[in-house]
UniProtKB/Swiss-Prot annotation:
Binding-site list for (S)-2,3,4,5-tetrahydrodipicolinate: H136, G145, T146
InterPro entries in alphabetical order: DapB_C, DapB_N, DapB_N_CS, DHDPR_bac, NAD(P)-bd_dom_sf
Catalyzed reactions per annotation: (S)-2,3,4,5-tetrahydrodipicolinate + NAD(+) + H2O = (2S,4S)-4-hydroxy-2,3,4,5-tetrahydrodipicolinate + NADH + H(+); (S)-2,3,4,5-tetrahydrodipicolinate + NADP(+) + H2O = (2S,4S)-4-hydroxy-2,3,4,5-tetrahydrodipicolinate + NADPH + H(+)
Major localization class: cytoplasm
UniProt gene name: dapB
Function of the protein: Catalyzes the conversion of 4-hydroxy-tetrahydrodipicolinate (HTPA) to tetrahydrodipicolinate.
Active site: H135 (proton donor/acceptor), K139 (proton donor)
The protein, known as: 4-hydroxy-tetrahydrodipicolinate reductase
Cellular component, GO annotation: cytosol
Entry keywords, A to Z: Amino-acid biosynthesis, Cytoplasm, Diaminopimelate biosynthesis, Lysine biosynthesis, NAD, NADP, Oxidoreductase
Family stated for the protein in its record: Belongs to the DapB family.
Amino acid sequence: MSKLRVAVLGVKGRIGSEAVRAVEAAEDMELVAALGRGDKLETLADTGAQVAVELTTPASVMGNLDFCVRHGIHAVVGTTGWTDDRLAQLKGWLAQSPETGVLIAPNFSIGAVLTMKFAQLAAPYFESVEVVELHHPNKVDAPSGTATRTAQLIAEARRKAGSAPQPDATVTALDGARGANVDGVPVHAVRLRGLLAHQEVLLGAEGETLTVRHDSLHHSSFMPGILLGARRVVTTPGLTFGLEHFLDLN
């Protein structure tokens, strides 16, 4: 069986360099390109890459994906900063290349994906739910893509269940004291030296609380999800948002 030809974009970052090692160690994959800032995207086509693992920046990701889709190269994307407009533009590109697949994953940690799923399942059974994400101080976006996605899934589950609005008697507050409001779910961001990537979902009802927490202690925790994404995206055309769709959780 021929090996899957994989390229990594963003190799100078911590997750990118870890992804290079993970692909090199995978028996069913061959690392054909490792690109950093300033390297030519044409290398992807020249080396016959089948999948590009995109781990760059919000400023670079759209240009990188435009190139990949135009050349029929599947993509596994961990870069954040996705808006409705950007997703619509990407879907437009994919419509012109219907056999190409793109996976965008707010988080590649299997445990983090399961945390989102557990929170989604539990949310309709509790009156109150809030999300707290905790990361290292070098993270450039807040709240994290994982926390935003978690809140969206929670809100969707509560809407489908017909849940009442969350109780909150706050009348006056300092700006930001109640966190960001994501579809009616408060999301709080902590930036602290010594942390990597952590999230907890706090759920409350009369007389009880439930906390669902996940901790990534090393960048290696993201590698099984990245490799899974690379293997599955080649047979999943179009746009897939969220690694949970490749985990058969339903």
